[in-house]
């Protein structure tokens, strides 16, 4: 059966998350329903990241095995036609070897977190960013964020229900940049623990507001204690923006991705 890689964009506010659940509509269910319509038989998909309710994606990746070959642009358009009016779009489809796995072949995930730092309420950005009314020092946040880069035990920044066997992760990038009222936080790693990005953002907000120093953030990390974490930032500001895969000859990813 030919395998296809799907690059998917969605507004997470409409869904209970990526993964199928009994308590509401998921992104996975929308795509699998569309695949059933064009394939004539049920198709299960696997995504690179199991994003939570309210978390968005501009470049989630999934793979699917279909009954016949499709021209990539025709497959993309057919899926999008069957998914309307759900706020999900396949932005690209391409054939891949049967050894490709959207989740386990990935070598890097990229996340963006968006904070709007102003007193006025959100209008166009409602549900798509975290509104923080107290003034934040983005430079202090960026400098403190470098404490978290590298290989660490991130127990402080993982959800209690995290399924990962180990809390050890290597954070390749954690950058904070302000453009006007918008503060963007970008994180990259091979894999993340459940709620890791949102937990780190919530703690960086404590630094930006002056409640914590970089030393306080380091102490929280080294405590390896969930109770030392700042608040978990709201899901609405988080976006899965990219997933990297190895070029031919590179080592494939081995760590599963559990969440953001």
From Swiss-Prot:
GO annotation terms (biological process): tRNA pseudouridine synthesis
Coiled coil spans: none
InterPro entries recorded: PsdUridine_synth_cat_dom_sf, PsdUridine_synth_TruA, PsdUridine_synth_TruA_a/b_dom, PsdUridine_synth_TruA_C, TruA/RsuA/RluB/E/F_N
Chain positions recorded as substrate binding sites: 111
Catalytic activity as recorded in UniProt: uridine(38/39/40) in tRNA = pseudouridine(38/39/40) in tRNA
Transmembrane segments: none
Catalytic activity, EC: 5.4.99.12
Residues annotated as the enzyme's active site: 52 (nucleophile)
Positions of disulphide bridges: none
One example GO MF annotation: tRNA pseudouridine(38-40) synthase activity
Family: Belongs to the tRNA pseudouridine synthase TruA family.
Quaternary structure annotation from Swiss-Prot or TrEMBL: Homodimer.
Described purpose of this protein according to its UniProt entry: Formation of pseudouridine at positions 38, 39 and 40 in the anticodon stem and loop of transfer RNAs.
Name of the protein in its database record: tRNA pseudouridine synthase A
Species of the source: Beijerinckia indica subsp. indica (strain ATCC 9039 / DSM 1715 / NCIMB 8712)
Gene that specifies this protein: truA
